[in-house]
A protein has these predicted regions:
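Conserved active-site-proximal phosphate/metal-binding subdomains
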Residues: 61-83, 89-169
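Active-site entrance/lid segments in N-terminal catalytic domains of soluble metabolic enzymes
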Residues: 1-78
Length: 169
């Protein structure tokens, strides 16, 4: 009804939504952080996958496989189209993604810093000022890893994770 042509799913198996979406003419791209998950998405009928390397902001999965390894493997094993995701920022990212077999690329964090994004200017400036050394991985002990821009709260969380060790559940 609203004209949505493509939906990206992530985090859980999208099988229960596929019939309704595809019957409505919507293409389903499932975000995957491993080739094994990408193959599962292909097997259940997803139209494409977004292969998300360890470089990504947000949830990089638990396998820690960067795009220079992940994308060629996906190209070798998948029969459905895939786009590269994770750490993508500009034309160089696109050229590299295409060279590794992707049909295109997906940028997430990069768009937070655009003038169109409804995000506070301080957040945009923090992203623009950040270097490759300014992110941290949190929630690893819970196997729900997230890559986040570091700040004092993140550093406190990491200290708490370290202090709690095996007691963190």
């Amino acid at each position: 009804e609203t004209g949505v042509k493509v939906v990206e799913t992530a985090g859980n198996n999208p099988a229960k939504w596929l019939p309704q979406l595809q019957d409505a003419g919507v293409k389903v791209i499932h975000k995957c952080t491993s080739v094994r998950h990408s193959l599962k998405a292909q097997d259940i009928g997803c139209d494409a996958v977004s292969v998300d390397g360890f470089e990504c902001g947000g949830h990089p999965g638990e396998d820690d496989i960067p795009n220079f390894i992940l994308l060629p493997r996906a190209a070798d094993e998948l029969e459905i189209p895939f786009v590269a995701s994770g750490g993508m920022a500009d034309a160089r990212s696109l050229v590299a993604s295409l060279a590794m077999g992707a049909e295109g690329m997906n940028m997430g964090t990069r768009f937070i810093a655009t003038k169109e994004a409804p995000v506070h200017e301080n957040v945009k400036q923090a992203i623009l000022a950040a270097s490759e050394l300014d992110t941290r991985l949190v929630m690893r002990p819970l196997r729900n890893t997230e890559r986040v821009l570091t700040n004092e709260a993140v550093e406190r969380l990491l200290e708490k994770e370290k202090a709690m060790g095996a007691d963190l559940k």
